Amino acid sequence: MGAVMIGARWMLGAALLSLVAPANAETLTINSGDPAAADVTDLLRISVERFEGEDGAAFAQALEAELAAATFHGSRFYRVVAPESGAPTDALVTGTVRASVDETPVIEKRRRCTEYDPADKKKCIKEIDVDIRCRRRAAVVATTVRLVAIGDGSIRYTRPLNARDQVTLCPDRSAPPSVEDYFAATFRNQVRTIRDDLAPRSYAIDVRVDESIKGLTKPAQTAFKAAVRLTKSDQTGACAAWTALTRDVEPTAALAFNLGLCNEMEGDLDAAADWYGDAQRQGARGSAVTEALARLDRCRRALGAWTARKAAMGAE
């Protein structure tokens, strides 16, 4: 418990605080982390080869930059090695990028007025169907990526990423974003997806507290609701108020859930799990408890992998 708690507390200072928006509702700010999807704990140095395809070089450069900037707990996650340098590397990322666009002529029908009411020029009294020549544009981006561990040649990660956008361009419609803009946005999204698969991430999220007063005595209801309101200005104070309530009343599902959030906010993941479990046993409604437990699991795995990685870094 101690190592997990200490590591989680460390995360409070290392999280991406820029992602936190001011809480407008009754929420508590939780700093957490997600592990890498791929098994990369022992891969400290990484190289990105040029991807195949016309856009492969630019895609690989963007991915290399994302991996070089990837951090966890305030430390760079990878040491990026240029593949042409000949320097030792632990992993090699390769892939393909294919972007294509296809346009086909299509005909759409429109109703056109051919005669207006002489007494009211805005009122149509006769319409006909006319053909409009349009173009149907289909833009496709097909990307594949693979990560190979140099030490044993094992494929640690492989994933296809496909995106498709279809629009119909007609002279009487406003123009949609250009195909170049679509390709650029898709490349950015795919690069970010790969980065999140290959490196852990820290983040902050505002989680809404449970406002239910069911099961509480009248005096406890008043104190509970006051703590809920306090979350807007003093989250620590709200948690202290809920904790004080447990000395006088049996925790309800809502109180247990909120105390789970408080402990998660403070980095005590074990205590948070206990409170969430209590809320779950008492029949807490909705998906909030399930989501909280899943978030705790991801955070624990991220912290565990980071501890193992630091050991590998020390051995190196």
Which residues make up each language-model segment?
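Bacterial N-terminal signal peptides that target proteins for export
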Residues: 1-12
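N-terminal signal peptide c-region/cleavage motif recognized by signal peptidases
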Residues: 20-22
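C-terminal/domain-edge helix-coil "capping" segments
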Residues: 25-41, 135-140, 146, 150-251, ...
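Residues embedded in well-ordered secondary-structure elements
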Residues: 37, 84, 130-134
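N-terminal segment of the mature soluble domain
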Residues: 38-106, 152-154, 281, 287-315
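Residue-level detection of beta-strand scaffold positions
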Residues: 48-51, 113, 147-149, 276
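Amphipathic beta-strand/beta-sheet edge segments enriched in Tyr/Trp
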Residues: 90-173
